[in-house]
């Protein structure tokens, strides 16, 4: 059934009442308002199409779209929670403690969320430990999931441990651990470089990164390295080269908030 907007879009010749052109009287099933007929002239013939003259169909469509949007958000939040290494405490952008040293990093994360599109360039965020990279990464993952983006957050040391444990054969396989990562649109690998993996885990890491590259997924990496080149000896040349191609660099120049809190406590007790 055509709507008034469609009538305008298709530039119908005119609107006709049913009685005017000898057509059956049709009414909206919801409000009972009589429908008109939109007449177009095509191939030497008049074609009359019933047209809704009320907003019922539009309202029903909008309600359906809103329901589908909420379902999609729930699916992606459930996906994030089921497949990620998330802490119990929720991390949000609103809870972020702003400092001059970390403001550029914060802005980079917010800008990513606001401007994300499928295939967006990723980020390699590096800097001192304890300066909020994980907090911002978790907040980003949650916001993207709410936008309907399939996102996953993995703490790399925990991911490596999961892969090591898969060798025992008592749990899930390495392939099953990796599959949700390669099926996501945005993947966050947090704390890469905290430990040097075995060659087997290196190969799995490259498989993950290369799969994301081939599927045009977006990769976000955080690391406590002081120089980007330090990653090469830790994760291997192949993974390193892929990250350089997939990510822009964001340097978090902040210092550890845990150290700052400890210093404040010490100062208060003097």
Residue ranges and their predicted role:
Residues 96, 154, 250-252:
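Hydrophobic residues at beta-strand termini and immediately following loops
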Residues 112-120:
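Phosphate-binding P-loop
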Residues 1-103, 254, 262-270:
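A short, basic N-terminal segment
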Residues 103-107, 120, 141, 145-183, ...:
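Short glycine-rich substrate-engagement loop in P-loop NTPases that contacts/grips substrate
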Residues 120-124, 150-151, 186, 218-220:
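Residue-level preference for the first positions of well-ordered beta-strands
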């Amino acid at each position: 059934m055509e709507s008034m907007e469609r009538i305008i879009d298709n530039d119908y010749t005119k609107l006709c009442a049913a009685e005017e052109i000898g057509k059956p009287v049709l009414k909206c099933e919801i409000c009972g308002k009589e429908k008109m007929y939109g007449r177009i002239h095509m191939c030497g013939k008049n074609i009359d199409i019933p047209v809704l003259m009320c907003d019922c169909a539009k309202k029903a469509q909008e309600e359906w779209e809103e329901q589908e949007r909420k379902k999609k958000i729930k699916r992606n939040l459930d996906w994030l929670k089921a497949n990620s290494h998330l802490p119990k405490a929720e991390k949000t952008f609103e809870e972020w403690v702003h400092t001059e040293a970390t403001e550029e990093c914060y802005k980079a994360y917010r800008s990513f969320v606001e401007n994300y599109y499928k295939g967006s360039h990723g980020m390699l965020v590096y800097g001192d430990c304890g300066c909020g990279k994980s907090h911002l990464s978790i907040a980003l993952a949650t916001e993207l999931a709410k936008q309907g983006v399939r996102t996953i957050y993995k703490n790399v040391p925990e991911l490596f441990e999961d892969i090591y444990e898969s060798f025992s054969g008592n749990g899930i396989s390495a392939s099953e651990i990796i599959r949700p990562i390669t099926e996501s649109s945005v993947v966050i690998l947090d704390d890469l470089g905290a430990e040097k993996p075995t060659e087997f885990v290196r190969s799995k890491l490259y498989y993950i990164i290369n799969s994301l590259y081939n599927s045009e997924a977006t990769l976000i990496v955080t690391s406590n390295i002081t120089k980007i080149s330090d990653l090469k000896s830790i994760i291997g040349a192949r993974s390193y080269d892929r990250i350089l191609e997939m990510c822009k660099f964001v340097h978090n120049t902040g210092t550890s908030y845990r150290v700052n809190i400890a210093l404040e406590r010490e100062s208060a007790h003097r």
